Amino acid sequence: MKKAILIDGNSLAYRAYFATWKQVEYAKQNNLPFNNAIRTMLLMCWNLIKANVYQYGIVSFDTKAPTFRDQIYEGYKQKRVKTPVELLVQIPLIKQALVYLGFLVCEKDGFEADDLIGSYANLFTKQEITVDIYSSDRDMLQLVNAFTNVFLCIKGTKEMVMYNNENFKSLFYGLAPYQVVEYKGLVGDNSDNLAGIKGIGPIKGIELLQQYGTIDNIYTNFNNLPNQLQKLLNNQKEIAKTFSFLAKIKTDIELDQNIDLTGLKPIQKQALIQLLSENKINTLVEKFSKI
């Protein structure tokens, strides 16, 4: 059976950078190029495609342009710390290095990297191609299905938790993948600045979804709820539905490439070595020279 690897570029680049941030200070002190994220992410991605047999490979990134979510909710992701300049300058080089490694690198104004991953995963699933998604973003868990697995990166790609159709409920509070966005609508998500419904914490949110399944069904059974819960939920349905919508990953956006053009390509060895050499990543120059 054919397999595709889909990587959340921003997520892994952040992990790569902050896992090795001490090297940034060393680079500053010695007037060297910032290269810690390039080196670490390239190693992550290389190890993933060497450890598994994939026929397709995509890494998606966010763009600087506002997304449709920003237009709906001005506060979306407003509390996130700005990306360090020392990482920003490495992103174009990371993208180029990944192309040399054989990946299709993609991005699309108006959408997040998640939406590209969701839409490509949907295309692969329709052709019964197994998909492995790698990210540290729990939003990706909503994409799990019979053909799609999500590897949640805890410490880069060295420590990961695999979510699939069989183990999902045991790992995610007894809920199903489609309920991830329902959970975020009720409980919120601090990382995206989604407040959820005031007074509804994780425990109560899980209980409600285990019993009623969706936000809509909770409100269908509103009169059967205890008085205290009714007070918390009263007139909050549209807020919860909005947050749930914002958390939902698009799976149907128009893509610039069809899946026939997303196959993993042979490594462009000399071009990759030149990029690594120019950015003083000597350990990887040696590594890829031996391939």
Curated annotation (Swiss-Prot):
One of its GO terms (biological process) is DNA replication, Okazaki fragment processing. The gene is polA. NCBIfam families: PRK14976.1-4. Its EC number is 3.1.11.-. Pfam families: 5_3_exonuc (PF01367), 5_3_exonuc_N (PF02739). Keywords: DNA-binding, Exonuclease, Hydrolase, Nuclease. InterPro entries: 5-3_exonucl_a-hlix_arch_N (IPR020046), 5-3_exonuclease (IPR002421), 5-3_exonuclease_C_sf (IPR036279), DNA_polI_H3TH (IPR020045), FEN (IPR038969), HhH2 (IPR008918), PIN-like_dom_sf (IPR029060). GO terms for molecular function: 5'-3' exonuclease activity; 5'-flap endonuclease activity; DNA binding. It is an enzyme of class 3 (hydrolase). 5'-3' exonuclease acting preferentially on double-stranded DNA. This is 5'-3' exonuclease. It comes from Mycoplasma genitalium (strain ATCC 33530 / DSM 19775 / NCTC 10195 / G37). Signal peptide: none annotated. Residues 176-269 form the 5'-3' exonuclease domain.
